[in-house]
Amino acid sequence: MKIGRFFESGRVMYRQWGKYELLVDTPHYRVKHVVIQPGKTIFAHKHVFRSEHWTIVSGTAFIELDGKEGLYYTDDVVDVLPGKTHQVTNAGDTELVIVEVSVGENVSEDDKVSTDVASDNLNSKKLVSESIVYLNPAFKDNLWGGNKLKELYGKKCDFDILAESWEMSAHESGQSIVASGRHKGMLFNDYLGTIGKDNWGWKCSTFADFPILVKLIDAKDKLSVQVHPDDDYAIANENQYGKNEVWYVIDCEPDSYLYCGFNRDVSREEVLQRIEDDSILDVLNKIPVQKGDVYFIKAGTVHAIGAGIVICEIQQSSNCTYRLYDFNRRDKFGDLRELHIDKALDVLNFSKYCPEKINEGIVDGEGFKKRIISQCKYFECTLVDIDSAARILGVEESFTSFLVLEGEGRISVRSINEPDKVKDSISFKAGDSFFAPKSTDIFMIEGQSKIIMTRV
């Protein structure tokens, strides 16, 4: 009997849904540290003699309380009064941590009345309520950046330098944040876990992580001469995807240029020597750029963005970059920036590279034009130039990213079976970024604008 009572009142208790730890335990006041595993549920019950006060420490909770339901996030607070039926589910893909404070005549486990309305089917909760969500970016202050992203797009950033704006990113180095709808405030990767991989589209089924990153780049100064690895090397050595990318030139100063590929065959030894004697630029293709130019940068291709260029970059979701040469620049602490020469030499393509601007055909629509600017195994990017309105069909195979480069207007989402009924509607301006899960909906885009649309 004594042993049984010890286990019933132990400091840490394990349950089918996770565990809790008693931090404070008195007859009328109890504090618990509750951990619920992803997808698990504390099923519906109520208390007669106590109230509970929950604070979400981390994770995403789907809570049903007294006939109402909703999503709750970090720092949200929930009060559960005596006699009110409640149920909590971990709706994310990481542990849900709650601090629970109980106050009342009886705060023990005896004061718990189970009900018959429990459900463990997350899908039945219809957690995906919006057909499209607005994303706030993550910002980067690399030393070569400027402030054109603030000037062109009104990016609200306190950094003195705004080099990059990661518009759609689930990467751990910088995540976007959902900024509209019932998931507002969630980190993008948490949101993706909440809606489930099925809603990314079937082309994403083989990916362990979300596959695409979309960013804006302001190169006030030149970037380092660098190279990205392919998937095989990056997964083996960096535990992340490789990096193939496409550049769309949004704006540039006169006589701007970039470097892409070697202008002749070179050897590993020659590249190493030219890094040491500061002559590596002599064997790179120097390419003048104009607004609207598009370049695909295949993994293994040496490259560098020149000064005075604003670019939209669509890439694999990777932050894997190996610097070969950085013009002997020093960081804000006065130290030479790190180079990654050995790894760069491992992945470089030393053959002559013949750069080509991507110039796919333009398809005329009613009130708009479409131009495919990249189509590869990793992503498909389409520039939609809208004069008045565009009708874009959603697809089952992929999510859709919308990045507004110019103009303003509104995106209305309509069911293909009920095209006169608006499911969701959201306004936009230049610099805005949106994510739409897979669907067969119709996206009606109204307003003169220019938008890059990305799918897998």
Over which residues does each language-model region extend?
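Transition-metal
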Residues: M1-G18, V31, D110, V117-V266, ...
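Short histidine-centered beta-strand/loop micro-motifs
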Residues: L22-D25, H33-V34, I42-H47, T55, ...
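Ligand-binding loop in jelly-roll beta-barrel domains
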Residues: T26-P27, Y73-T74, P82-K112, I217-K222, ...
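Glycine- and acidic-residue-biased ligand/ion/polar-headgroup-sensing regions
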Residues: F49-G67, A179-G181, Y191-I195, A219-K222, ...
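Short acidic-glycine-tyrosine-enriched beta hairpin
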Residues: G67-T85, L284-F296, S415-T440
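An exposed, glycine/acidic-rich loop-and-rim segment of catalytic or binding clefts
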Residues: K125-K126, D277, V283, V294-F296, ...
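Active-site glycine-rich loop that binds ribose-phosphate moieties when present
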Residues: V266-F296
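Acidic/His-leaning functional-site neighborhoods
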Residues: I358-D432
